[in-house]
């Protein structure tokens, strides 16, 4: 049973022959801008384990599926939903699943105030874009403070907010009004700065911005 198996490499090389053939097809059909961190082609998964098309078994450390692959309760829920309908844009028609999930999120979100509302985005960058729009609409302020070292996404606005400039080469001009403060991380204090001075140092960087 894959769920309880240990990692195992059965091919002489990685990727194996079947995986290499699919990776070559990927390279021919999709842009290289969509990088790939590891030379495997997944065939199936159970729990935290995945098996590739050549039979190699890996422990998935990414953690996006934090309940694991093919979790039976989730599989049954997907099957049940697919039997009813599988797509309905929420700005065209209302469906209960969206409402139930929003209600659940609002019931547990640690946000002050009696009124809470939630909506769902397709990606982190889209969520960040909407968070900025909501903040600007509510405050009437034009500027944004972001931290050094931060990654926010690869849309035009979130690239501007992201500290790593490799993502933004050749993509300008960018929106104005984005200012960067030092992220409070004791391990990266300026050389020779004692820890007891670091808190005021990082707080003052926000005031300076």
What is the predicted role of each segment?
Residues 1-46, 63, 202:
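Active-site-adjacent loop/helix segments that line or gate small-molecule/cofactor pockets in enzymes
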Residues 3-11, 16, 58-141, 145:
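Glycine-rich loop-to-alpha-helix module at the N-terminal edge of alpha/beta enzyme cores
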Residues 9, 42, 67, 159-161, ...:
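Short clusters of hydrophobic/aromatic residues that line enzyme substrate/ligand-binding pockets
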Residues 16-20, 24, 44, 68-72, ...:
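Electropositive phosphate-/nucleotide-binding environments in soluble metabolic enzymes
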Residues 51-52:
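Hydrophobic alpha-helical segments, especially N-terminal targeting/anchoring helices
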Residues 103-209:
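PLP-dependent aspartate aminotransferase-fold enzymes
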């Amino acid at each position: 049973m894959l769920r309880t198996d240990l990692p195992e490499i059965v091919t002489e090389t990685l990727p194996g022959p079947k995986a290499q053939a699919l990776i070559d097809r990927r390279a021919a059909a999709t842009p290289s801008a969509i990088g790939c961190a590891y030379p495997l082609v997944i065939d199936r998964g159970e729990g935290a384990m995945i098996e590739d098309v050549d039979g190699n078994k890996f422990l998935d450390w990414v953690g996006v599926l934090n309940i694991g692959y093919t979790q039976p309760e989730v599989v049954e829920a997907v099957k049940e939903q697919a039997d009813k309908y599988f797509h309905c844009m929420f700005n065209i028609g209302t469906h209960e699943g969206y409402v139930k999930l929003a209600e659940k999120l609002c019931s547990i979100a640690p946000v002050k105030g009696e009124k809470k509302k939630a909506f769902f985005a397709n990606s982190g960058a889209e969520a960040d874009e909407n968070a900025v729009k909501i903040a600007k609409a509510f405050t009437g302020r034009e500027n944004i403070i972001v931290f050094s070292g931060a990654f926010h996404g690869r849309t035009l606005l979130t690239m501007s907010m992201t500290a790593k400039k490799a993502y933004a080469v050749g993509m300008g001009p960018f929106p104005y009004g984005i200012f960067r403060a030092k992220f409070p991380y004791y391990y990266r204090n300026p050389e020779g700065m004692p820890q007891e001075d670091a808190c005021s140092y990082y707080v003052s960087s926000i005031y300076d911005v």
